[in-house]
């Protein structure tokens, strides 16, 4: 095969793809279990009939941006829309990352932050979370001071661990970061607070959101960012012409007419999350608290349930230490990983697909 090699810095990378398996219960990608209302489907079908398919869509997606702006009480000039929040993140990294620039994440966290950063040619530096997966201001300050990142990602609630970041920590990060701070809020509606109040034209912070989780629209691949006007202008520079098709635009506009349905759905998911957390804490599992629409847990070989994953000495079965450093725990991590894989397979054999989180550092044997 006369194959031409890809870039040297991409040779060790593989694609980021979640399994798609036909099973009765699919939980591995945190999609909404709730279908959109029938009225939404009806209204969208009518709106699709008005699309002029022989013409390019509105390049600026003005009506959609205005509708999102009204939802968050900002100006349309503070809104950037794209094909899922992943394209939002890619646009940020094309604008502010790249060769000679550094991107900071705090592991374990959403893997596409570092994945897209590397594709964009950025150098990625990883800070550490505490043993309970919270993030300390000292660690954030160390990473910002030592590495001077052009882009700093905070995921709140954090995927895959489930906790929202402390609002005071987010504010202090924004105040001290040398570059832009992106708060990934794909699951924000399930949590008690948001970083949106920090966004203004004098700040270097932006908040990314998605229609995939709370709006029951994962099939549409629609996301957006709320940021200062100068950042939206920069993102428009790197966006491809007519990048958001007409169908996505009308789907988003139509969905935003059903805010109350979305909010009821979120409330139902939160209630079910709390019920499930309560039940899981009676089982032989290590279970972490969640402020998202998923729960991180590790099957416990000792047969005793734990909450939060941290014992009084700060140790965990994956080898995490109370100082926030992590390893896969050597033999203990290998044993935990094997137990986790067996439970994952057992669930799959019974029609339930969950996420095996062992590929994240420090999450050997964990499932989500």
Regions found by a protein language model. Name each.
Residues 1-55, 148:
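N-terminal "arm"/small-domain region of PLP-dependent enzymes with the aminotransferase-like
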Residues 270, 280-304, 332-350, 367:
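Conserved PLP-binding catalytic core of the aspartate aminotransferase-like
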